[in-house]
Swiss-Prot record:
NDH shuttles electrons from NAD(P)H:plastoquinone, via FMN and iron-sulfur (Fe-S) centers, to quinones in the photosynthetic chain and possibly in a chloroplast respiratory chain. The immediate electron acceptor for the enzyme in this species is believed to be plastoquinone. Couples the redox reaction to proton translocation, and thus conserves the redox energy in a proton gradient. It is found in: Plastid, Chloroplast thylakoid membrane. Signal peptide: none annotated. Its EC number is 7.1.1.-. One of its GO terms (biological process) is photosynthetic electron transport in photosystem I. Coiled coil: none annotated. Residues 1-46 form a transit peptide. It comes from the Eukaryota. GO terms for molecular function: oxidoreductase activity, acting on NAD(P)H, quinone or similar compound as acceptor; quinone binding. This is NAD(P)H-quinone oxidoreductase subunit L, chloroplastic. It catalyses: a plastoquinone + NADH + (n+1) H(+)(in) = a plastoquinol + NAD(+) + n H(+)(out); a plastoquinone + NADPH + (n+1) H(+)(in) = a plastoquinol + NADP(+) + n H(+)(out). The gene is ndhL. The lineage of its organism: Eukaryota, Viridiplantae, Streptophyta, Embryophyta, Tracheophyta.
Length: 191
């Protein structure tokens, strides 16, 4: 027997009546002879099947609505216990964390390292304190960027092919890094 494509889930039927008169159930297929059934009987059977499919389709819709209501009810069960009713959605929290992480790890460390490079010997006490605090706050991001940022001008000797090569004449390379105790800030300009 066909179930008209049903899922096998039905809404409960009403309880039978408690009346005492017996019911006689007649089968819709009363075949008393071995001959071919007439057209009216086939027409009645087709109408019954169509009606059953319509009823089952309505039951499926009702079941889907009930299932949706149950899922909506158990979506946030902790709200009834904790009383937190205005919690942020997970998508907005993840988006905020992503924006802050990009700013913390990708945007600020190169800016801070360039600021340290440019103002290294020209800073006063307050600027040195600010630079220290920014380095302290953004230390993980600076550690990630440090191997990739190199502000020194390489190669210093035009004869060197790679920055890690040894120069042929080391005395010809101008060294400006050891002037600090007696240097003026202009001595450290990298032009």
């Amino acid at each position: 027997m066909s179930r008209c494509g049903s899922l096998g889930l039905y809404a409960p039927n009403a309880l039978p009546s408690l009346s005492l008169k017996p019911r006689s159930v007649k089968s819709p297929f009363c075949i008393t002879s071995h001959t071919k059934p007439n057209d009216t009987l086939l027409h009645n059977v087709n109408k019954m099947r169509a009606k059953a499919c319509d009823i089952l389709g309505a039951k499926k819709t009702i079941l889907a609505a009930q299932l949706g209501a149950v899922l909506a009810t158990i979506d946030h069960p902790a709200l009834a216990i904790t009383g937190v009713n205005n919690q942020q959605e997970l998508s907005s929290v993840v988006l905020d964390i992503g924006i802050i992480s990009v700013w913390y790890f990708l945007v600020m460390p190169p800016i801070i390292m360039n600021w340290l490079r440019v103002r290294w010997y020209r800073r006063k006490f307050f600027e040195m304190y600010l630079q220290f605090m920014f380095v302290f706050m953004f230390f993980p991001g600076l550690l990630l960027w440090a191997p990739f940022l190199n502000f020194r001008k390489f190669p210093r000797d035009p004869n060197m092919k790679n920055p890690w090569d040894k120069p042929t004449d080391p005395d010809s390379i101008k060294n400006v890094y050891l002037k600090y105790p007696y240097a003026t800030p202009e001595d450290y300009d990298l032009d």
